[in-house]
């Protein structure tokens, strides 16, 4: 805690582990997601302490949650907020040690292991199958069930590979992951994503958003080609 001050009846803002004091008092995440149940506080703390990464860490989960809610609203879908919160903040847990299993898709492994985090946190475990279904379906290549939370989380996660945020995420992986082992590989991944990912979207709202995000990526890639001797000097 860096400092705290009380002036009259007003608290001054301070920073506590990356959160402002006003957020701590309001019990919300950095992006304003309410932590209105104790199990949510526990799950969020787990993600903050264990799932840090430039491309699929805590902030990515916050974006997925917020965007999934917007997609549900846009398509008029009723979603279970508990299921969405749990799935959004745990969907990539098996991309991290010690939860990863070599040779297994992190979506399936994460779905299998999510209960071990949720049950001691006090999550309503009758909803676990829906959380697991959403986690299994979150990747762009996954088959998506008819459950609304699975659909909007899948689309939110896919949209997060497109647009300016998609470019930022993939470039951040350069030299660290196979899909971006160097800059030319990162650019090839971005080109493939801009062409192929929109077709995997389910909701009408996501499909509409994808149009703008693909245009953003194509503009970036065109400028990059122009500034790198048609990509030969990356």
Residue ranges and their predicted role:
Residues 1-12:
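Bacterial N-terminal signal peptides that target proteins for export
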Residues 10-22:
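Bacterial N-terminal signal peptides
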Residues 33-34, 50-62, 66-78, 90, ...:
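Divalent metal-dependent phosphate-bond-processing catalytic cores, especially two-metal-ion Mg2+/Mn2+ enzymes
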Residues 47-51, 72, 93-101, 118, ...:
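Short amphipathic alpha-helical interaction patches enriched in hydrophobic/aromatic residues
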Residues 64, 106-119:
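An active-site-proximal "capping" alpha-helix that borders the catalytic cofactor pocket
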Residues 81-100, 106, 110, 130-139:
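His-Asp-centered metal-binding catalytic motifs of divalent-metal-dependent phosphohydrolases/nucleases
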């Amino acid at each position: 805690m860096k400092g705290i001050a009380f002036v009259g009846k007003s608290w001054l803002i301070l920073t506590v582990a990356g959160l402002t004091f006003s957020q701590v008092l309001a019990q919300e995440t950095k992006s304003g997601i309410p932590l209105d149940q104790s199990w949510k506080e526990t799950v969020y703390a787990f993600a903050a302490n264990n799932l840090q990464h430039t491309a699929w860490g805590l902030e990515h989960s916050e974006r997925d949650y917020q965007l999934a809610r917007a997609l549900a609203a846009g398509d008029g879908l009723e979603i279970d907020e508990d299921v969405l919160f749990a799935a959004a903040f745990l969907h990539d847990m098996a991309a991290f040690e010690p939860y990863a299993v070599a040779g297994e898709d992190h979506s399936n492994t994460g779905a299998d292991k999510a209960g071990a985090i949720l049950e001691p946190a006090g999550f309503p475990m009758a909803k676990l199958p829906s959380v697991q279904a959403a986690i299994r379906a979150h990747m762009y290549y996954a088959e998506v069930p008819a459950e609304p939370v699975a659909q909007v989380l899948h689309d939110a996660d896919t949209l997060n590979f497109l647009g300016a945020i998609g470019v930022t995420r993939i470039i951040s992986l350069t030299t660290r992951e196979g899909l971006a082992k160097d800059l030319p590989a990162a650019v090839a991944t971005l080109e493939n994503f801009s062409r192929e990912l929109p077709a995997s979207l389910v909701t009408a709202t996501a499909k509409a958003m994808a149009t703008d995000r693909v245009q953003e990526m194509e503009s970036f890639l065109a400028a990059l080609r122009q500034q790198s001797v048609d990509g030969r000097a990356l």
